[in-house]
Amino acid sequence: NYFGGSVANSNPLVTSSGTAALGADYTGWNNKYNLRLCGYQFNNYGTLLYADSSIKFQLSKALSFNLAAQSGTNNQLGNSSNALTNANLGQISSNFIGVQGVINYDWFSLNLGYNNVWGSSSAYGSGSIVTPYTYGFATDPLYTTPYMSGLADLGTAGTAYKISPTLTFINGNLSLAPAYTVFNTALAEWNGTQEYDFVASYN
């Protein structure tokens, strides 16, 4: 069991009996194409269906492009009540899409991401994604989730844009990755939020 307080803007003191998950992964075209399909049943916290796909174009030894897309839906799937509706926070009803483009050239790469999350204005967070196990960790798969908090962490529907270049040095052992993310959200308190990050790593 886990406590249901781990969603944004709320603290319903309700436990869940757990989560069931099922997924499939396909890779082809010499490992340059990938398709993933996943389903999660967060007991008492809704159902999440998710898919993403990516393809890589290797133009030369140093130059490559990656294109990716993702989509999903988050709802109650026949359950009339859950931890959020019982706490009068609205039903779970969300849809989301995202696209990502990455260019890699030798020691430099540039990552551009976009996400759109939407739902009923009467839903939790005006259509926010409910992900109890990733909230606060910035580990959800949205392309625009930055280091600190993304749309799921903010508990709101809306759009997000992210740009993140990466520079590598010393035969790829040193990596410097600044990032900028901006959010246009359905909830006024988060609208216009910007996050700047900088990650340095050495192997």
Residues of each region from the PLM?
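A short acidic, glycine-rich active-site loop
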Residues: 7-12, 146-148
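Short Gly/Pro-enriched turn/cap motifs at secondary-structure boundaries
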Residues: 12-14, 153-154
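Outer-membrane beta-barrel pore domains
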Residues: 39-203
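Short, surface-exposed connector motifs at secondary-structure boundaries
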Residues: 30-36
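Solenoidal tandem-repeat scaffolds enriched in leucines and small polar residues
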Residues: 13-19, 26
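Outer-membrane beta-barrel channel domains
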Residues: 1-6
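Well-ordered beta-strand positions
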Residues: 25-27, 102
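Functional cores that coordinate and move charged inorganic groups
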Residues: 22-24, 37
